[in-house]
């Protein structure tokens, strides 16, 4: 295939209106990482492409190089993950998975590990009832693949191994602090040993092993809050999907 065209498998991260009838797509592809592409006429009622280009659809695409960005010439749905569209809560979690990847990545080439994590996570949301494990596992392994793995085994300030007691976490320093260091370093927040134990377990385990963990509700809430704090620090802004998830969970 010439350098004027590209065939990829990709997940649609988001789309927006472009011109009078077109749609601008943000894609994450297996072959080329993050891409932007225009789907000509996708907003027209009779467009054959429109149904293949909705967010969290996995789609096979043929792209042609335009003046400034790729143009979609063919689109064929591989998996629409329909159950994720039938529940507002699952829609929210799927949107969070996409938004997190979208905010953290740029158009910088292939990353097969990230693409596989994305596909695995969408499939897990379809079949696994414990969405907490799916999402926390995704967050931790996404951070790992992006080079932001939080250090959870030794104090990031003094280097001493973590002892079986409550500790501190500092987002700016990228990991856990022992009680002595955490108490005197600004920006540190307490974290229980139970939360650290399960976060470390998720980091080093397979998804199947993580799914077997029996995690108390209070510890789940603490893990979610700590990862949200760390991710918000890294992105320097909040995300939209968590507020939607909270709203539909309360309704």
Residue spans of the language-model regions?
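Non-catalytic alpha-helical scaffolds and adjoining flexible linkers that form interface surfaces
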Residues: 1-251
């Amino acid at each position: 295939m010439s350098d004027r065209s590209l065939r990829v498998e990709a997940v649609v991260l988001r789309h927006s209106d472009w011109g009078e009838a077109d749609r601008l797509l943000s894609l994450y592809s297996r072959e080329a990482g993050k891409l932007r592409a225009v789907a000509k006429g996708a907003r027209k009622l009779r467009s054959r492409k429109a149904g293949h280009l909705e967010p969290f659809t996995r789609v096979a695409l043929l792209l042609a190089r335009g003046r400034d960005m790729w143009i979609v010439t063919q689109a064929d749905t591989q998996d629409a993950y329909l159950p994720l569209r039938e529940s507002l809560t699952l829609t929210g979690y799927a949107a969070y998975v996409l938004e997190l990847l979208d905010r953290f990545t740029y158009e910088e080439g292939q990353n097969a590990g990230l693409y596989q994590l994305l596909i695995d996570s969408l499939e897990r949301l379809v079949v696994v009832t414990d969405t907490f494990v799916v999402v926390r596992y995704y967050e931790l392994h996404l951070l790992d693949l992006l080079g932001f793995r939080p250090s959870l085994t030794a104090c990031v300030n003094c280097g001493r191994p973590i002892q079986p007691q409550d500790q501190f976490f500092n987002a700016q320093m990228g990991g856990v602090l022992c009680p002595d260091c955490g108490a005197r370093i600004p920006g540190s927040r307490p974290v229980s040993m139970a939360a650290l134990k399960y976060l470390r377990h998720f980091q080093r385990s397979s998804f199947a092993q993580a799914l077997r963990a029996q995690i108390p509700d209070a510890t789940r809430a603490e893990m979610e809050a700590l990862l949200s704090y760390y991710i918000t620090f890294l992105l320097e802004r909040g995300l939209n999907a968590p507020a939607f998830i909270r709203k539909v969970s309360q309704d």
